[in-house]
Amino acid sequence: MDWTWSILFLVAAATGTYSQVQLVQSGHEVKQPGASVKVSCKASGYSFTTYGMNWVPQAPGQGLEWMGWFNTYTGNPTYAQGFTGRFVFSMDTSASTAYLQISSLKAEDMAMYYCAR
């Protein structure tokens, strides 16, 4: 019976640990074509440089699309095809925050942009 409680405790402890991970993004913004926007994603509950940060836009009426990821350990970005040039991933390690900057906004950039660990 003791081993059963140990297993249950380990499962509960693991669940509690993961539930503390949070990614908090900057608020909603409306910009005009040609403008720039910088979206932030503040991480907490884990070591920021242990996991990469993915960026995933969702255009109105469309599914999620992976636009790339940022290696928070090395600082190297990887961009999916179609997301180069105007799109820049960056980070502030001391603030555990990742950023997505989009310049020269176009109508087709209209989407919700999500960060994902």
UniProtKB/Swiss-Prot annotation:
Region feature (Complementarity-determining-1): 45-52
Gene3D superfamilies reported for this sequence: Immunoglobulins
PANTHER family attached to this UniProt entry: IMMUNOGLOBULIN HEAVY CHAIN
Region (Complementarity-determining-3): 116-117
Region annotation Framework-1: where it falls in the sequence: 20-44
Organism of provenance: Homo sapiens (Human)
Region of interest: Framework-2: 53-69
PROSITE patterns: IG_LIKE
Region annotation (Framework-3) ranges: 78-115
Protein encoded by which gene: IGHV7-81
Quaternary structure note: Immunoglobulins are composed of two identical heavy chains and two identical light chains; disulfide-linked.
Residue ranges of the region described as Complementarity-determining-2: 70-77
Annotated localization: Secreted; Cell membrane
Annotated GO MF terms: antigen binding
Annotated SUPFAM superfamilies: Immunoglobulin
Residues carrying covalently attached carbohydrate according to the record: N76
GO biological process: immunoglobulin mediated immune response
Function: Probable non-functional open reading frame (ORF) of V region of the variable domain of immunoglobulin heavy chains. Non-functional ORF generally cannot participate in the synthesis of a productive immunoglobulin chain due to altered V-(D)-J or switch recombination and/or splicing site (at mRNA level) and/or conserved amino acid change (protein level). Immunoglobulins, also known as antibodies, are membrane-bound or secreted glycoproteins produced by B lymphocytes.
Keyword list, A-Z: Adaptive immunity, Cell membrane, Disulfide bond, Glycoprotein, Immunity, Immunoglobulin, Immunoglobulin domain, Membrane, Secreted, Signal
Signal peptide span: 1-19
Main location: secreted
Full protein name: Probable non-functional immunoglobulin heavy variable 7-81
Disulfide bonding pattern of the chain: C41-C115
Domain called Ig-like: residue spans: 20-117
GO cellular component terms attached to this protein's record: extracellular region; immunoglobulin complex; plasma membrane
